Structures are given as structure tokens and as C-alpha cells.
Amino acid sequence: MINEILQKSEKKMSASLDVLLQELSGIRTGRSSPALVEHIRVEYAGVPTPINHLANISAPDPRYITIQPWDRSCLSAIEKAIMKSDLGLMPNNDGNIIRLNIPPLSEERRQEMIKIVNKRLEEDKIAMRNVRRDAMDEMKKLEKAKEISQDDLKRGSDQLQKITDNFIAKADKLGADKEAELRQV
């Protein structure tokens, strides 16, 4: 029973870490990457849709990203979505393709991005701690109902803490790597 709770918690924490990784890949570092804009949602046919579902995104060189929609009618919607995003990019629409110039980051913008990284990292850690809390509550209910012993509760609690510490360490490493990438000039 405890193993099921631990496995469920581990899956949830792993999913949370995957979301963090996806969010961090979308934070601008001064180099072009399709991941920078893939997550941006465009209002298309009344439904928020990720750009990568509407267009081909490529990075032909380190300073440009090109977005070529499969349906030209969504060009202006993609352009608006990029302008609304917190990336600070100005799209250049030529009627067929949207080009994004990726300027080098100013020191001020680097600091803003580092704050965003730290904010997302903290949100992820909170989510992991909430998973831990929920799992602990489940185990305590089982102990109260006399389905597991106090020793089992203690062992499960210790294992859960190790799992949580492991995932938080992984999240910290992702955050530190992204911060180091942002600090490179």
C-alpha cells in the first residue's frame, strides 16, 4: 500500500520536473532555439493552440527564428501571441513567414530572466512539496485506520522524504544550469 503511494508520488514529481524543464527551455538566453516559442499559445479558431501545432519553427542561424504557418490566415494571430508573450521579441511578418530577431540580452534583461527562472523553480518545488504532503496525509489515514503500523508510516515517510529531496535536487540543478546559461555573455 505504501509502495503504491510512493510510486504515485514519484510519478507526479517526475511530471512536475518535466513541466519545469519545458518551461525553462522556453526562456530566452540570447541564442535562437525553436523551444523559445513552441509553448506560446495562439488563439486559432477560438481555441488556444501551441505555435508548433500551427507552423514550422526553425532556427536557421543563432540570431533568428523563422515561423512558417501551414495556414497563412493565422499569421496575424501568431504575431499577436508573440508580442503578448514575456519574451520581449518583435515579430517581422512578410506575409508568408514570421522572422524573429534574437538580440543579445542586456544585463537588465538577463536579471529579469534569472528572476523568472527562480520563480518557476520555486513554483515547481512547491508543487513537489504539495505532492509529498498529500502522500503523507494518505499514509497517516492508513495508519489511523490501522491498515499500516507506525513503523510502516515512519519508513514510508523517510522514503517519501528521500524521493522529494532527490527531485528537488534535480530541479535545483536544472535551475542552476539555466541560470549559468543566462549569465554567459
From Swiss-Prot:
Gene3D superfamilies referenced in this protein's UniProt entry, alphabetically: 3.30.1360.40, Ribosome-recycling factor
Keywords annotated in UniProt: Cytoplasm, Protein biosynthesis
Location, primary (coarse class): cytoplasm
InterPro entries: Ribosome_recyc_fac, Ribosome_recyc_fac_dom, RRF_sf
Subcellular location: Cytoplasm
Keyword Lipid biosynthesis: no
GO cellular component: cytoplasm
GO molecular function: ribosomal large subunit binding
Pfam families: RRF
CDD domains linked: RRF
One Gene Ontology biological process: translational termination
Family of the protein in this entry: Belongs to the RRF family.
Biological function: Responsible for the release of ribosomes from messenger RNA at the termination of protein biosynthesis. May increase the efficiency of translation by recycling ribosomes from one round of translation to another.
Record protein name field: Ribosome-recycling factor
Source species of the chain: Dehalococcoides mccartyi (strain CBDB1)
Lineage: Bacteria, Bacillati, Chloroflexota, Dehalococcoidia, Dehalococcoidales
Gene that this sequence comes from: frr
